């Protein structure tokens, strides 16, 4: 069934249309990818879904219009996100950093048992008492994903989770994302520049350019579509070989 639906969504900053009459659907239990050139409006779409900006059009979650709701209400409804640059709490331990997420979730309060489960799930058990500021890049990414999972989301939105990662770290994060989807049954939306990551992880891929939808289809069809190659994949064909 359709879990999230964007209907004719438009966002202007002055005269610039960052998102231009964009419509798409995300089905429950799936991994949905969003890609496009730099400045295509991908992160703006995330900011609209999670209540950071007002906009024209509608966004529906579980059939309910969430347009215009503040971010904390959207988090409580079951939508969690991460950011391109890991947002950590340098003065807190890993355990406390993940606990912060549980306070903002649907349950509306700290759940130590759930926090423990999340720490184990994202494989930060050994770092539990460590200061978050001392984590390496992979650890910080896992912490941010863990804090989002602690909210008990129905949708987890990942914004370029592989940014800055080496091949081994990318493999590690891809495994974690697959487990979140398959083992926890959480629907995932992922923005990513690495097309190989998107073709391996996602079941549906949306390509946008200048805030407009170019194509939404299964990854194999998307990467071979001439419109997509022209707008986005011109320099990335080598990555697919």
Where does each model-flagged region fall?
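Glycine-rich phosphate-binding loops of nucleotide-dependent enzymes
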Residues: 1-240
């Amino acid at each position: 069934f359709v879990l999230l639906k964007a209907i004719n969504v438009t966002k202007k900053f002055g005269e610039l249309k960052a998102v231009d009459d964009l419509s798409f659907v995300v089905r429950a239990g799936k991994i949905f990818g969003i890609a496009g050139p730099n400045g295509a409006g991908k992160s703006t779409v995330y900011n609209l879904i999670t209540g950071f900006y007002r906009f024209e059009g509608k966004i529906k979650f579980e059939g309910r219009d969430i347009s215009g709701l503040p971010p904390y209400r959207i988090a409580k409804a079951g939508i969690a996100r991460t950011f391109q640059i890991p947002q950590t709490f340098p003065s807190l331990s890993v355990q406390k950093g993940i606990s912060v997420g549980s306070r903002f979730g649907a349950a509306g309060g700290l759940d130590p048992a759930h926090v423990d489960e999340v720490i184990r799930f994202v494989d930060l058990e050994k770092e539990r008492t460590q200061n978050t500021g001392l984590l390496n890049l992979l650890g910080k990414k896992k912490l941010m994903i863990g804090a989002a999972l602690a909210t008990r989301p129905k949708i987890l939105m990942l914004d370029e989770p592989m940014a800055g990662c080496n091949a081994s770290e990318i493999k590690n994060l891809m495994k974690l994302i697959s487990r979140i989807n398959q083992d926890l049954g959480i629907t995932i939306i992922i923005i990513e520049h690495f097309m190989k990551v998107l073709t391996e992880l996602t079941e549906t891929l949306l390509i946008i350019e200048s805030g407009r939808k170019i194509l939404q289809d299964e990854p194999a069809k998307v990467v071979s579509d001439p419109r997509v190659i022209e707008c986005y994949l011109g320099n990335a064909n080598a990555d697919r070989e």
